[in-house]
């Protein structure tokens, strides 16, 4: 990249940071991205708070690669010591909410797309999609535009991975479980106290082990994350509500895991959604071979992204470090941002 292009990329990231873009409230950052497309002469489409564009010489006879990252953020961590919406550049870092997750990846993919937008001699088409509601796996994010896009053969999802290539990603089921008992006054004996059943059921979840252990993602992980019961000190509640977080490796189908819990769990249990399945791409895929030639490390990701909503092959890669995501005083290194653009280009040059 030229110095001017580097400055432009940094400037765009800072504009994005300055603009609050909480999930479901991304309208203002979308305006910034629309302006960027217009300034660069790129035709785009919009649905809700999602934008996408095709390369200028899109050819339906060619396979298509989707480039995707999100522009929504979580609420700022309460431990911030700086203004989360003021993009300070200091010590080679750009600070601000969404700088790392996933502003850096989004900007890197936009400048990658800009560099190939006018190319006529590519083996693939490219679509760039800047999408909403990733942080909440919302219905009005990438899921809402998939049917509006041409057939996608493969996707690159931009998330902070230190430019390592995530070739597998855990799926997620959140279960709401209910332990039933008999309500009554605390002064009287009660042999059907829902709270007293809790330790045995918690132990069932804690002892749970699934046979298939992934080399990339490890075992299926089951964690009770919330417990709620009672409303008054002298009343024995009729039920205890618990929330269970289940992270699924690529060796299981999400419906298989759901069926197990529904039939085997010692209390009532129901999944909130079965949309966030695990993902995995064949090690023989062209993008994996390209990464190997460049010495890019592959790994399995424990964190969730929009990959879970896709029904075509995908990988996750981007500048930044996922450990900084959702943290106080979030930041990305300037070099990570600019190097990310070049790594994306090198990765695709091997196949396009």
Segments the model singles out, each with a brief description of its role:
Residues 65-67, 129, 154-156, 315-317:
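Hydrophobic/aromatic beta-strand patches that form the interior of the parallel beta-sheet core
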Residues 62-127, 334:
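Active-site metal-coordination/substrate-binding segment of hydrolases
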Residues 102-174, 178:
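Acidic/histidine-rich catalytic neighborhood of metal-dependent amide-processing enzymes
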Residues 2-76, 239-243, 257-260, 334-345:
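N-terminal helical capping/dimerization or prosegment-like subdomains
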Residues 4, 167, 176-352:
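Metal-dependent amide/peptide-bond hydrolase catalytic core
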Residues 71, 134, 160, 186, ...:
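Active-site metal-binding loops of divalent metal-dependent hydrolases
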Residues 44, 87-89, 224-227:
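A structural signal for short hydrophobic beta-strand segments in well-ordered beta-sheet cores
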Residues 14, 34, 107-110, 114, ...:
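Predominant activation on well-ordered alpha-helical scaffold segments within soluble catalytic domains
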């Amino acid at each position: 990249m030229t110095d001017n292009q580097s400055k432009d990329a940094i400037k765009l990231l800072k504009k994005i940071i300055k603009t609050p873009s909480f999930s479901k409230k991304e309208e203002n950052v979308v305006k910034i991205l629309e302006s960027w497309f217009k300034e660069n002469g790129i035709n785009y489409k919009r649905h809700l708070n999602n934008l996408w564009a095709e390369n200028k010489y899109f050819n339906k006879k060619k396979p298509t690669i989707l480039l995707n990252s999100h522009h929504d953020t979580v609420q700022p961590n309460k431990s911030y010591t700086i203004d989360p919406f003021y993009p300070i550049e200091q010590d080679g870092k750009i600070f601000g909410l969404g700088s790392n997750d996933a502003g850096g990846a989004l900007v890197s993919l936009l400048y990658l797309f800009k560099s190939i937008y006018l190319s006529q001699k590519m083996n693939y088409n490219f679509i760039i999609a800047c999408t909403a509601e990733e942080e909440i796996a919302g219905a009005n994010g990438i899921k809402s535009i998939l049917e509006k896009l041409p057939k996608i053969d493969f996707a690159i999802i931009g998330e902070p991975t230190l430019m390592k290539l995530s070739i597998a990603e855990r799926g997620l089921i959140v279960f709401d479980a209910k332990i039933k008992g008999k309500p009554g006054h605390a002064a009287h004996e009660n042999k059907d106290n829902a709270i007293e059943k809790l330790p045995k059921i918690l132990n069932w979840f804690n002892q749970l082990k699934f046979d298939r252990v992934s080399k990339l993602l490890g075992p299926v992980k089951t964690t009770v994350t919330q417990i709620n019961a009672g409303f008054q000190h002298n009343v024995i509640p009729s039920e205890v509500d618990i929330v269970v977080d289940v992270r699924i490796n690529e060796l299981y189908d999400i419906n298989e895991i759901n069926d197990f819990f529904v039939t085997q769990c010692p209390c009532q249990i129901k999944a909130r959604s079965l949309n966030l399945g695990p993902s995995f791409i064949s090690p023989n895929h062209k993008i994996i071979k390209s990464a190997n030639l460049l010495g890019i490390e592959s790994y399995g990701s424990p964190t969730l992204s929009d990959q879970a909503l896709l029904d075509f092959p995908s990988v996750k890669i981007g500048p930044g470090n996922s450990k900084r995501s959702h943290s106080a005083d979030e930041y990305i290194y300037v070099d990570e941002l600019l190097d990310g653009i070049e790594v994306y280009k090198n990765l695709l040059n091997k196949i396009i």
